[in-house]
Swiss-Prot record:
Lineage: Eukaryota, Fungi, Dikarya, Ascomycota, Saccharomycotina
Family, as annotated: Belongs to the major facilitator superfamily.
Localization terms from the record: Vacuole membrane
Gene: MCH1
Membrane topology field: Multi-pass membrane protein
CDD domains: MFS_Mch1p_like (cd17354)
Pfam families: MFS_1
One CC-aspect GO term: fungal-type vacuole membrane
InterPro entries, per database record: MFS, MFS_trans_sf
Protein purpose: Probable transporter.
Assigned keywords, A-Z: Membrane, Transmembrane, Transmembrane helix, Transport, Vacuole
Descriptive protein name: Probable transporter MCH1
Amino acid sequence: MVDERTPLKAVTTREDAPTAVMRPKPVGKSIFALSILGTLSAASISLFSMYGQTLQHKLGFTQVQVNSVSISSLLGMYLLMPVIGYLGDTYGSNYLALFSWITFPASYSIASGIFSTAADWHRETGEALPRAAPEMALCFFFIGASTSCMYYASLKASAHSMSVYFAEDGKLQTYTPGYAIWGPVAAFGLSSLWQSQLLRAVFITGKNVNVAGIFLFFAGLYAVICGIIFFSCRTAESMASELRKKAEASTDCNCDGPGHEGATLKEFFTDKTAWLFLLCFVFIGGPFEMFQNNMGAILDTVTVENADSPSFSTHVSLFATFSTVSRLVVGFSSEAMESHVSRPVLLSVIALVAACIHLMVPSGIFTVFDNAKYFSVVTIVNGFSYGSSFTLVPTIVTKVWGIANLGTIWGSFILALAVGSLGYGLLFAKVYDAASEVGVGSMSQVCSGVHCYGLTFVITGTGLAFAAAAVFFIWVFMWKKRGIHM
């Protein structure tokens, strides 16, 4: 019989149902809730823009130095993700939680001290403290790494806490419900919302930003939350190990190590659908990252007559709101409609809608017609699609390759996203700079008009359409034939 990895209710209704089903203990629900709490607190790194310029004003940093601090955090978070995932898969996610428990509070505490010392130096001398920028960059590198460790540890604990183990055809099988994956992912998206509101209410007064206070707050927060996640991971892994042993002992099970929870790394990297799906994620995630990072530049190209220019802050809020809403809506709906609409089909439809919008942007209907009145449509669709992809893709990854090497595999997808973000970001910059030299505003670095971004959106729209078709093809002609249900 083919390994179908179907939902457990489908498995247990068959005549040849498994002889024993090992369901999570009641404590599993508590671990799941604590995992949600972990990712709901993990996205402090995304708030850098709220205090980044204060480093320039109060510490005398150049813009290059400010950017170096921000880039260091991204390097720690994205580039180390596959390594962090591999270490978690091999040695246990509790070690990653322990690492974040140590480095998160320590890095933020040290950063607070550096800020206070550098601020005093700048007030007295009018110059930047020479060692402040590299030291701050090093702190934020570890903050980025701690973010990935905490995120992955929470995700793996959630997966273990809700997974069901059963023996079928002499082999141990695992079923992980979709909400055990998209739940923590959606919570991570919500994290920056409540944290940003708290910072505005407590640490920001007008243009005055209490950066040292912000750093100390996060140091205290993570000293508590990371400790909770550490003990949750230990409990989750212990419970999962016990359930596996009971399922193995319940029948004549020919189990050969951790592969029964999903694909081995060799199986993943030799699976041609893995590389195709990675490529699809580059073409899906890259355009949304590009739009998010260059939204201000796009809005600056819009020329309006007798009207106010579109508000950048309004569109940032729209993007964030619909990104968050989509994580919840798509997460719940994909779970509820699992037996009717598969997640790859849902991802294809969302990518196709986004492709249509991107291909319509060069026409000027959203940016030129009626003083850019309908530009919000572009923002909403990109925000919704961005959040949806971060809900659907990790769930699909789990359904296809299991949770045995979830950290390494999902880390590879995060790395693919970084490649897409970099590639499409460079594309936007090249098109923008080329247009500014020949179009309106050619005497300055500022570009105005559709030609500043038209070619970029044609390419992103085409890439999204290709990815939508490719995901649908992979699902219908490859995954479905393997008997994978999602």
